[in-house]
Amino acid sequence: FKGVVAASYGRIYFKNLIGRRTSESTALNFIANGEGYLGQHTLATLMFALSSYEPPAEVMESYHVPAEGRITESAEGEEKVHLYSYRTPDYVMGSVLDYHPGEPGSQEHVLQVMIKDCDTQIWINHPGEAVYFGEGRPGYFAGNGTLPLIRQDKNCAVAEFHLLDQEVQYTHAFCPLEQFSEWRLEGRWLFLKKDNICAAVYADNGIWITDKGPLKNYELVSPGKDNVWKILVEEESVYGSFEKFIHKLHQNGGKER
């Protein structure tokens, strides 16, 4: 999406999640398609740039997304892990479905949303440690202490958590509010707008925006061992306005799908 990987990962680090422009894969995308960023990782980038290799036509075609969006599903690895992604020209939502829910996690990145660019992103996880920028595997934002059950249908995803007896007894979302042109917290809902795209984040146990420290306006916290998060992304034109988007979700109780 826009030249960066925006999907579930089997192994992730916080520095990679927030530093999308620095990954080697984005430089490869830049050379192949003109989208992405050139960084300081040069091994594969240099070999690709100097070689005569040209990606197959089907790979190049995958860069182009129709206006109505595209669903991509695959089974990866020895366990045939079910990866699901829905991508439009303006946003992408990707997840791993039914991956060991309720079991201890590691560095799996299980749910990811990007809107318009690689800086406007949202993901939900259970912190594997209480230290913000520690060395734990899983960490505070990278990976999950307890893995959730995830379901996704195109632009809507649900993450159901039942936490084990671990250090952190809440779940949270990374959500940089400064990247959005408008946002509004109403009850258990956080509504957001970025240009022509609307998004809604919901948690059964309520949402609190971290209002101090290094994560001020970057973190959404929801308490409790048992919790359900929902996230929906849609074009504003589908509803007519941001206000109508909010009204519709309140009216339907979030049951858009």
Could you say what each language-model-derived stretch is?
Residues 2-257:
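Ser/Thr/Asn(+Pro)-rich, low-complexity disordered segments
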